[in-house]
């Protein structure tokens, strides 16, 4: 359990950083598909 408590925040931080990076890159190349007026 102690190993899980030490690795979970690291995995979560890497996951959120990767997700944010993918969204930023996608928005840079395809801005109209992500934020299109409804």
Curated annotation (Swiss-Prot):
Keywords: Membrane, Photosynthesis, Photosystem I, Thylakoid, Transmembrane, Transmembrane helix
Pfam family, one: PSI_PsaJ
Transmembrane feature ranges: 4-24
GO cellular component, one term: plasma membrane-derived thylakoid membrane
Cellular localization per UniProt: Cellular thylakoid membrane
Membrane topology, from the record: Single-pass membrane protein
UniProt-listed InterPro entries: PSI_PsaJ, PSI_PsaJ_sf
Gene Ontology biological process terms, A to Z: photosynthesis
SUPFAM superfamilies per UniProt: Subunit IX of photosystem I reaction centre, PsaJ
NCBIfam families linked: PRK02733.1 (NF002743)
Similarity-based family: Belongs to the PsaJ family.
Entries under PANTHER family matching the protein: PHOTOSYSTEM I REACTION CENTER SUBUNIT IX, PTHR36082
Biological function: May help in the organization of the PsaE and PsaF subunits.
Name of the protein this chain belongs to: Photosystem I reaction center subunit IX
Organism: Synechococcus sp. (strain CC9902)
């Amino acid at each position: 359990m102690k190993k899980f408590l030490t690795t979970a925040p690291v995995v979560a931080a890497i996951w959120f950083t990767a997700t944010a990076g993918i969204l930023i890159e996608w928005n840079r190349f395809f801005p109209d598909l992500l934020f299109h007026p409804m």
